[in-house]
Amino acid sequence: MAMPRFSVIVPARGVQGFLRHCLDSVLTQSFEGVELIAVDDCSDGGDGAIIDAYAAADPRVVALHLERPGGVGPARNAGVRHATGEYLLFLDGDDFLAPGALAAVDARLRAAGEPDVLLFDHDRIDVWEKRHGSADREFLEAHADTVFTAEDVPECLAVLPASWNRAVRRDLWEAHRFAFADGPYDDVPVVFGVLLAAARIACLDQVCVTWRKRRRGSASTVPGRHHFAVIGRYDALFRTLAGTGLGGGTEAARGVLFAHAARRLLRIMEDDGRVRAGDRPDFHRELARLLRRHRPAGAELPAHLNSYAVYRSMRHAGTLRHRTAKKLRARKHSTARSVYRRYYGLQLRRPIDENLVVYAAYWNRGVLCSPAAIHAKARELAPHLRGVWVVDRRHREDVPPGVEAVLVNSRRYWEVMARAKYLVNNANFSGTVHKRPEQIYVQTHHGTPLKKMGMDLRRHPAAAQGVSFLRMLDHADQWDYCLSSNPHSTEVWQRVYPSDYETLPTGYPRNDRYFATTAEDVRRIRAGLGIAPGTTAILYAPTHRDYERGFNPPLDLERLAEALGEGYQLLVRTHYFYGADSRLAALEEVGRILDVSRHPSVEDLALASDALLCDFSSLMFDYAALDRPIVVHSSDWEAYRHARGVYFDLLSGEPGDTPGHVAGDEQEIAALFHSGRWSDEHSAQLRTAFRERFCPYDDGLAAERVVRRVFLGEEDLLPVVPLTERTVAPPPHKAEPCAQA
């Protein structure tokens, strides 16, 4: 087998939301002489499974799994040890190659006579998907037709010091035994070392890689003293240059490297996302010590680099006007604050109540969904905790007896929001709530995403009307934990709500009921709804459509009820965005349907039904955990997927995409039920694949996992019960055996 031209090494840990794009960007290159070495750094997310799937599908992919987490540097080193290509390229798991990049790199390498190192251009993409050019373009353009060494052109040492903007001959790497360091800023020794060791360096003035600038969620974006490590990296680099023959011995090269180090370290110190304000004096002190120690002959340190007091006064003078304007704006707004908001400010100064948990669901609509399941389990496993629910005035009468609740924006509301140790929500608290550092916020979400969510909505204006993406990011920045019921959700949440929370693969607590309900419970729920024994109950729950005002049933419910005929009962539940509907009330009055829109528990409705008739609602993912038949109504799929955007083709008919039979109108739906196809073997096969993809963690223990991990501090999550070993609530025809005799 011929040696590949390039070995592209991709370390992966906690990047499952971006990893597929990264790997695809390599494998879809027009240039074919590539091996892709993907290294799973002992990730507890879905990175390893993604890598294995790609390796199984493409022989060019080499999957490596480290036995213990080592960080990006050791993961890259492991990849290098398995590389067989002529040139090494490195790509982070959340970055990606530009189309045609490898072909362009290959062409430039050949034109330059196979140099030791090729530097190429990059761009940067931010959370808004805005692209920014690099500061290296001018240098790369100026040297696009030359070959040089670092001593000839020392300015090459000022090119962005990253592992992913250069191709390095593997024999050079092995001859000098280069290796990435262990810990933060692992690439400093390597990126400069290869340039200083290279006998021939060339440049390519073409963007070959896009660097995804993460706002939060990676080690480089978490502030802390671990960023001090970069000073030690440069100290070691300068010491190496002084004591070895790795080139760079000329004063010009040392001067360029010195100036680069000063600029870069100062930028790191000034970055609020890296060095906290309280740590800056110490960082500056170590920075100044480094620069004094390795200052080239004749060079003088500017006053702001020699003294933190001088630096601070200069920085303060430069920002005083901005800060003054900001204070004036804040003062203007503060005059409009309510008495309760001032009361909230006072409460924020009081100690945290370590035993207080605040719950909310669906923008304060009541005791519902996964927060309700967590609350119930906390009462059982952590009775020392006191739970308080936030509700609005319309729903305060719906609070069950024995459950403590506060009205949103009341005096008590501001008190508990300021002092609770734990905050649990499936949506968002008010934007005026500011989470204290000591508080722990659990975001449960309220459904697996079929439709585009979060930052992905920017491409879908019909769905994004009234959405503040800045506020959305502010909300995500408050989360400490984000619950996930499947790897698909984990990937989506990480990408569309970019921040530094921890994702917990717990399953959805609201679905625990499906595994704790008995046949007697099923009979009781059906009787309470008025469903006659032996009746086939079909739960119809259409989703909200952003391109329509109000509830417009996609199906003619009267025609459907008539087509179904005797022995069938339609349970119709509108989306919670809508209020009471007179058309449904009229149909219910004449016995055509049961309007269950205001029923407090969608879980009860699922348990009472024999089948789900859905369109594009996330309820289908929860219902699949019950392992009961699902029929998809598809009439406006094209309009929905173009207006809202979707993550996969629900109607593809492929296992894992489609949960059951698909029908386009009322007659097709009725025909499916009359023929028995709604629950046939093909339906079961589709449902099984759908469950495997979207219900891997839903095993009845989700709420317990959350309580034990978050409230009780247990590190290890309870193991997941395999799909084949789970016992779900019996379907009605088994719960009512006599009725079917």
Annotate the PLM regions.
Residues 66-83, 96:
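Glycine-rich, basic loop-to-helix element that forms the pyrophosphate-binding segment
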Residues 125-127, 366-382, 495-496, 506-586, ...:
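Conserved catalytic-core segment of nucleotide-activated headgroup transferases in glycan assembly
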